[in-house]
């Protein structure tokens, strides 16, 4: 193994290797969470007409006292005649105001009679929504790289779009190596364990916006590794292999990747857990495949995926690779490692001075249950002694609303 590189350098190499994927049109009903491939410029005004903000009566300029009610304007069924002095038109919220409308008076402020209405003095412009006051034609309503949230989908629909031009979602193959791995739901042989990495990593792929192309367990065999990895490289945009990347006699993943033409970018990161992480690229005629060799220990696999593969999957879609980060105050001291930065599983809570991070307890890389209580990974820089309580540290969020914040109003 070469000299381990810092986390920031490893991420830089990963992100600099990325070629954005091609774009496709996605119906709005299927576009939640997708990433825009281009700016969206509105061709329409929103709202498309001057309308009423209240149920009431549309009034001409200077109207007060007794007015003749000459008609009604309903949402979707506008009154088409212009307002004249001494008249009013009953109007519903959201309905277009007739030509000549100066204001709308709410229904609760008037006295109605037979065909007439008594109205108080009403200032011009009252309760009238102007055409284009939300969006003007030519406005950029969403930028390339925006992730489509429910409000964003609503905005697209409001400007008349039925689909969005989005970057294609990356296809991600997940392989787990080891003779001991057994599919969950089957009986364990002596010395075997149920394979947890494929399903855990698949969940991280989906959370990053990718599509799981396959999950597969592979025995500790050089030929089997070459075949499985070769098949994955042929069909996926990203290949993640857990296990087999260290220096043991049964670690065949690095050799298989190199034999298949994958160009190594780095092997070894100054990180705990996750030191043996491997990354490389394979260039084909019309595409580039990213290949990650992740440690086999379950926590190490999830941590290194979060730090390196997840930003890559986001960047392939044109999304901000570093969006899910924050700064927090350590609530208790953490011993530093002299040669490696540490990704410490932590629980986040909110306080007046910002987020606070408290380690979840034992940090062994095989203890997957330790991830259950974690909202984030606090990055503790290498050095002597300890990171004291009160120190501000960078935190990689693990997804969703941190549990310590979920009860906030």
Task: Please tell me what each predicted stretch does.
Residues 2, 7-8, 13, 58-219, ...:
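Short, glycine/charged-enriched hinge/interface segments at domain edges or termini
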Residues 1-7, 162-294, 298-304, 315, ...:
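Helix-rich terminal scaffold detector
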Residues 15-22, 39, 97, 139, ...:
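Structural signal for hydrophobic packing residues in well-ordered secondary-structure cores
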